[in-house]
Structure formats: structure tokens, C-alpha cells
């Protein structure tokens, strides 16, 4: 698992590759 970018809400974080899912609702 990779860390997500700073400021990315945990629910928006794709934990396996550390990508912030910015297109997800509420992100």
C-alpha cells in the first residue's frame, strides 16, 4: 500500500496505489 497525497480524504484514497480519487463524490 502507498500513502495518498497530502490533503486527500481517506474515503477518496485508493490505498493500493496511493491515488486520490478526485472524481469520486465528496472528494
UniProtKB/Swiss-Prot annotation:
GO CC term, one of those recorded: extracellular region
Subcellular location: Secreted
GO molecular function: toxin activity
Disulfide-bonded cysteines: 4-13, 8-20, 12-27
Keywords: Disulfide bond, Knottin, Secreted, Toxin
Tissue expression pattern: Expressed by the venom duct.
Domain text: The presence of a 'disulfide through disulfide knot' structurally defines this protein as a knottin.
Protein name from the UniProt record: Augerpeptide hhe6.2
Species name: Hastula hectica (Sea snail)
Amino acid at each position: 500500500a502507498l500513502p495518498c497525497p497530502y490533503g486527500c480524504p481517506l474515503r477518496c484514497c485508493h490505498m493500493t496505489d496511493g491515488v486520490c480519487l478526485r472524481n469520486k463524490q465528496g472528494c
